[in-house]
Regions:
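Hydrophobic alpha-helical transmembrane segments
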Residues: 1-79, 122-225
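Basic, amphipathic juxtamembrane/active-site segments
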Residues: 82-84, 93-134
Length: 225
């Protein structure tokens, strides 16, 4: 038992390189990732896991489309998609570090591109599910998410620190919220509209806060040069 704990702790140290997490579930999530990377067959590469993560996001987008045109029960497919996305997206880079084959810049670029394709697919499903009268909310959601990605990249450029979390909230917490919202929408049809408005407003407020903080960092860096 003690030996297994020491092994898990060592793996945790390896996979935590180059990434500082602040999200609520980080303690349990990192332990789960440390366990899973040891179980991934050698024939599975980090690129394959990235592709699996993308498939998960595409499934979430598809669930909205099927929910809009066939039956809202298809939204439950999005729950499976969230789990698949977490598996691929969380393990791809960490697996590379575990196998001592980190590709920092390649992985960074691939992550950003795949995330953008995935969120666009979800956004398209978002818009179709909400209907034409509320499509501006869907566009707003995509725009706010895109701005969040831009701020993250600029923060990395200015501070040389890359973080995928915004305070206590990270991608995993967002997935959990999406899962909860999908379940509620299946039970109480129409509630998704209110969530969409709320989520877009939260992203707007978060982007304003992070943007102002980013300008402060940029100003401090200019003054230090």
């Amino acid at each position: 038992m003690k030996k297994n704990k020491e092994l898990l702790d060592n793996v945790l140290k390896v996979i935590a390189k180059d990434r500082e997490r602040t999200n609520i579930t980080r303690k349990y999530e990192q332990k789960a990732i440390a366990f899973l990377v040891q179980c991934i067959p050698l024939c599975i590469s980090s690129n394959m896991l990235s592709a699996i993560g993308l498939v998960g996001n595409l499934m979430v987008g598809l669930s909205f489309i099927l929910g809009a045109f066939i039956n809202s029960n298809f939204l439950l497919l999005g729950i499976v998609g969230c789990f698949i996305n977490w598996f691929g997206d969380s393990l791809d880079g960490r697996l590379a570090y575990y196998r001592s084959k980190p590709r920092k810049w390649y992985g960074f670029c691939l992550d950003i591109m795949i995330d953008w394709v995935g969120i666009t697919a979800i956004g398209v499903g978002f818009i179709l599910y909400l209907g034409s009268q509320w499509k501006l909310i869907g566009y707003g959601f995509i725009a706010m998410y895109a701005l969040e990605m831009i701020i993250t990249l600029l923060r990395y450029k200015i501070t040389n620190k890359y973080s995928i979390d915004s305070g206590l909230l990270g991608p995993t917490e967002v997935r959990l919220v999406i899962i909860l919202v999908l379940i509620i929408e299946v039970i109480f049809h129409g509630s998704f509209l209110y969530f969409s408005i709320f989520a877009t407003l939260i992203l707007l407020i978060s982007n304003i806060k992070d943007g102002l903080q980013l300008l402060k960092f940029a100003d401090e860096r200019d003054k230090s040069n």
